[in-house]
Design a protein with these regions (language model features):
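Cys/His-rich microdomains that often coordinate metals
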Residues: 66, 84
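Glycine/serine-rich anion-binding loops at beta->alpha junctions
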Residues: 179-208, 226, 331-347
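Long, charged N-terminal interaction/targeting segments
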Residues: 1-54
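Contiguous, small/hydrophobic- and glycine-enriched helical/loop subdomains that border
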Residues: 174, 197, 201-238
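Short linker/helix segments within small regulatory modules
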Residues: 67-76
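Conserved, helical-rich catalytic subdomain that frames metal- and/or nucleotide-binding sites
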Residues: 233, 238-333, 348-354, 358-361, ...
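ATP-binding N-lobe of GHMP and related small-molecule kinases
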Residues: 90-188, 206-215, 252, 261-264
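Short cysteine-rich clusters marking metal-coordination/redox-active sites
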Residues: 59-62, 77-80
Length: 373
C-alpha cells in the first residue's frame, strides 16, 4: 500500500485556495488590464497545484488513489468506504467478546503441519470480556488490561490482531489504545483470548473500514488462531479442518448454562499429546447434536454432548466430579469444553441454573450462570 501523501482535508483546502486565487487573478487581470501572458501563467500555475493535490490525494486507510478531486466526490473512499475526513471517524468503540462452549469435539488424525483435524460444534454464551478501542495520537499503540496480564503486550493476541488488521488493510495515520476488561477465565477452553482478538478486529472495522465484510475479517482471523474466525460472527457453527472451516448452524434453542472453572488447568498441547498416545478412544461425532439443532430440540442436543478430551483427563482431575454435580443439580447434561478445564451444564430454566450455580460457587468461586447467545 502507498502511504497518503496529502490527506483529504489538506487536499480540499489546496483545491479551494487554488480556485479562489485563479478567480482573484482573473479579476485583477481584467481590472488592471494586465497581459494575457500573466493571466495564462496564473491559471496554469493554479491548475497545476490543483491537479497535484488531486493526483496525490490518497485514502488514509487503504492508501489507494482517490482518482477524483475532493470537491467532486463524497467524504468516503470509493475503494474501502473509510471516512476521509478526521471528524467523520469515530474516536472509540466498545465490543463484547463472548465466550464459547464446545457441544461436541472430535479430534481426528494429526496433519503434516502439526495441527489435528477436528470436528466440533461451538456455540456462543453470555459470559463475556469487554474490549474498548480508542484512537490516539501516539507515539505508539497501547494495551491496558484489567486485571493486568503477565505476558508482554506485544505477545498478546489483541495486539497481534491489531498488526494483522493494518498489515492487510493498509497504513494507519494514528495509533490505537486497546482496553481489555477480563471476565472469561483463562486456560478454560472457553476461547477468551480468541474472542478478544476477534473483538479487536470487529472494533477496528468500525473505526477505520465500516464496509469491510465478515468474510474479510474471517480471513484475517485465520492468521491469529483456529478459534478466532468463529468469534467474528458468533452464534452456533460446525468447525472442521483445524477449526477454521465454519458452517453456520441453526441457533440453539433458548437455554441457560452453568459454567464452572476449577483451579486445575490443562495445557492444550499436553491434552492433544495424551490423545495421540491413547491406545483407543471412542471418537465422538456431531450427528446427534446437529439433528437436535435442526429440530430445536434441547433434550436431543444435551443427549448428544461429547468431547474426546474427557477421555484423557489427568489422574485426580475434578472434572468428572463437577460433571456429575451439575447433573445431580438438574442439568440436562454436562461436559468439559475444549481441552478444559471449564465444565458447563445445560438448563432449560434460568431459576434452576441459578440454584445450581449458587451451590457450586461455594466450592468453585469461578462459577457463572449465563444464557446462550
Amino acid at each position: 500500500m502507498k502511504k497518503p501523501l496529502i490527506n483529504f482535508k489538506t487536499a480540499r483546502i489546496i483545491e479551494i485556495v487554488s480556485i479562489v486565487l485563479m478567480l482573484i487573478l482573473s479579476g485583477l487581470t481584467a481590472l488592471l488590464e494586465l497581459s494575457k501572458t500573466f493571466l495564462t501563467s496564473s491559471i496554469v500555475g493554479g491548475l497545476t497545484v490543483y491537479v497535484v493535490a488531486a493526483l496525490f490525494d490518497r485514502c488514509p486507510c487503504c492508501g489507494r488513489n482517490l482518482d477524483r478531486v475532493s470537491l467532486l466526490r463524497d467524504s468516503f473512499c470509493p475503494s474501502c468506504g473509510a471516512p476521509l475526513e478526521e471528524d467523520l471517524l469515530p474516536r472509540h468503540v466498545e465490543e463484547k467478546a463472548c465466550a464459547k462452549v464446545n457441544l461436541t469435539l472430535s479430534v481426528r488424525e494429526k496433519r503434516p503441519d502439526g495441527y489435528h483435524e477436528v470436528e466440533t460444534v461451538m456455540t456462543g454464551v453470555g459470559l463475556h470480556d469487554t474490549v474498548t478501542l480508542y484512537r490516539n495520537a501516539g507515539p505508539w499503540d497501547k494495551l491496558e488490561c484489567d486485571p493486568p496480564v503477565t505476558e508482554r503486550a506485544g505477545d498478546n493476541l489483541c495486539m497481534k490482531a491489531l498488526r494483522v488488521f493494518f498489515g492487510e488493510f493498509g497504513p494507519k495515520k494514528d495509533f490505537v489504545t486497546i482496553r481489555l476488561e477480563k471476565t472469561i477465565p483463562t486456560q478454560a477452553g472457553l476461547g477468551g483470548g480468541s474472542s478478544d482478538a476477534a473483538a479487536v478486529l470487529r472494533g477496528l472495522r468500525t473505526l477505520y473500514a465500516s464496509n469491510m465484510t465478515d468474510t474479510q475479517l474471517e480471513k484475517m482471523a485465520e492468521k491469529l488462531g483456529s478459534d478466532v474466525p468463529f468469534f467474528i460472527r458468533g452464534g452456533t457453527a460446525l468447525a472442521t479442518g483445524r477449526g477454521e472451516k465454519l458452517k453456520a448452524l441453526p441457533d440453539m434453542p433458548p437455554c441457560w448454562l452453568v459454567i464452572v472453572k476449577p483451579e486445575e488447568s490443562h495445557p492444550t498441547a499436553a491434552m492433544y499429546a495424551a490423545l495421540d498416545r491413547a491406545a483407543a478412544r471412542t471418537g465422538g461425532n456431531s450427528r446427534a447434536v446437529l439433528a437436535g439443532l435442526e429440530r430445536s430440540d434441547l433434550s436431543a442436543i444435551a443427549a448428544g454432548l461429547n468431547n474426546d478430551f474427557q477421555q484423557v483427563l489427568p489422574e485426580g482431575s475434578s472434572i468428572p466430579v463437577i460433571v456429575e454435580a451439575l447433573r445431580q443439580l438438574g442439568a440436562l447434561n454436562a461436559q468439559m469444553t475444549g481441552s478444559g478445564s471449564a465444565v458447563f451444564g445445560l438448563f432449560r430454566r434460568r431459576e434452576d441454573a441459578e440454584v445450581a450455580a449458587s451451590v457450586l460457587k461455594e466450592d468453585y468461586p469461578q462459577t457463572f450462570c449465563v444464557p446462550q447467545v
